[in-house]
Amino acid sequence: MANQATTTYKVTGTQKAVSNLWNTLQRMEVNSRNIWLDDLAKHYGIDYQKKHICVRGHIYWAEYEEDEDTSLLSFETETAWDACNDLFFEINRLLDDELSISYRCCECGCEVYYTHDEDDYFPEECCVSASGEPFEDCCDDVYGTIGEAIREWTSKTGIEQGERTDEQMMDFINEYEYEDDDTYFYIRTFTFE
């Protein structure tokens, strides 16, 4: 079974192009059911096999916002191993390259954490994967700074940062051995494309 990547997308562009994608998702009943990416590719007439575009996954949430200046479509996908960005790039090509696509991908199993941000939608520096006591049940949360993630860990464990730099402390936390083998707290920094 593949590891699951969760990717958050922020899509802007011309009102016509953004509305096209949003209206398509609405017709496919987004927010009522999962929208499988192969179905989305077929809707746009994309031969994903011929083009070697991965479509293993689905959109599980979307929302559209519009004001006088901006059309913004936000949605999240769950996909196998990595984000399926090539599908959305191909949809953009079909919509006359009128979309600006920003995204943040988190896949903790293979430690894939990256951001492509064409505006300022994803300023966060890192993602924390944590489970077990004294942390909550398995969760992945983004943090604005590595320092914020470190403070979260020190507040839960009672272990102080002391003279360690943030980099040294992050290494200390990532290598820390807990009494229970199922407990972990990993700070993973985003790569910015």
Give the positions of each predicted feature.
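Intrinsic low-complexity, intrinsically disordered or marginally ordered coil/linker segments
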Residues: 1-193
